[in-house]
Amino acid sequence: DGVIISSPHHAHFENAKAALEKNCHVMIEKPMTTNVKDAEILIELAIKYNKEILIPNGFNFKSFMSKAEEIISNGLIGEIKHLDAAFSSSLIDLFQGIPLSESNNHTFQPHASTWSDPEKAGGYGWGQLSHMFAGILKITNLDPECIFCLSVPSPTKVDYTNAISMKFTNGATGSFSGSAFVPKNFGGTFYITIHGTIGTLYLDMEIKRERLFVRLNDENIIEHKIKEGDGAYSYGTKEALNTFVDICLNKNVTNHSNGELALKTVKILEAMYKSLKSKKLERI
């Protein structure tokens, strides 16, 4: 009933296409594909065969993400005017072609080229910012319009860092950051701040800093408690996998990281890498 795709980035499309054509639901490791054309083909196949695509972006399945989405969709901060977000993790080894040290004792060790080869969609954007943008797009439901990006390259010529400026179709602006330079055994950083016409939403997932609250222009505060350790430090894909199993069992569940969301993410990342090469603003 369902197929899980956990192959290297550049092989996702071929594997997922074959599974959908066999009438199976698919769970595809992020990113869904490494170019927009392939992502659109998978969406078309999913519609044709009435199948679900799920990307296990674990943060999207956290309750605080759904709460943030609810706050925004209910208009509690008004019209979105600006976003800023950052995602950082301890992965300089991967992006310079050294196998991930955390996998030393695993039965199978992934090839480092998955993340370090620029010809195989290596780099921090494809490998990590897919998480960040999936979360931002889920919460805001915005559509990206254009993007500019600067980066620090690794020895293998993939991106270690990303400094991104973006414009959305509703006129809002965004400033986004990615970095592989975080000490090991920390859990990394992931925060999203969304500024609206009547308030600002703050979502922070860094260890010992976890919080979700809204500060309104009338000085009222709306707070949703996040337990310490339940943010970036507790990242996992259990909730996503459970949802996928329920989808295969034909249960009525919410797919918090579906194919349409993944397509938007791929559109952003493809344009981001175009900007890195052209050193110009690129349309999405």
Show the residue positions of the predicted features:
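Rossmann-fold dehydrogenase core element
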Residues: 41-59, 79-82
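Contiguous beta-strand/loop segments that form the cofactor/metal-binding neighborhood of enzyme cores
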Residues: 127, 131-208, 238-252
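Predominantly a Rossmann-like dinucleotide-binding segment in NAD(P)-dependent oxidoreductases
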Residues: 62-148, 155, 279
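C-terminal helix-rich "cap/oligomerization" subdomain common to oxidoreductases
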Residues: 2-5, 40, 48-51, 169, ...
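Hydrophobic residues in well-ordered beta-strands that form the structural core
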Residues: 5, 28, 53-55, 84, ...
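A short helix->loop->beta-strand "cap" motif at the edges of active sites that frequently abuts
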Residues: 22-24, 49-51, 172
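C-terminal glycine/acidic-rich active-site capping loop/insertion
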Residues: 58, 100-112, 190-260, 267, ...
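Beta-loop-alpha module in the N-terminal Rossmann-like domain of NAD(P)-dependent dehydrogenases
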Residues: 1-45
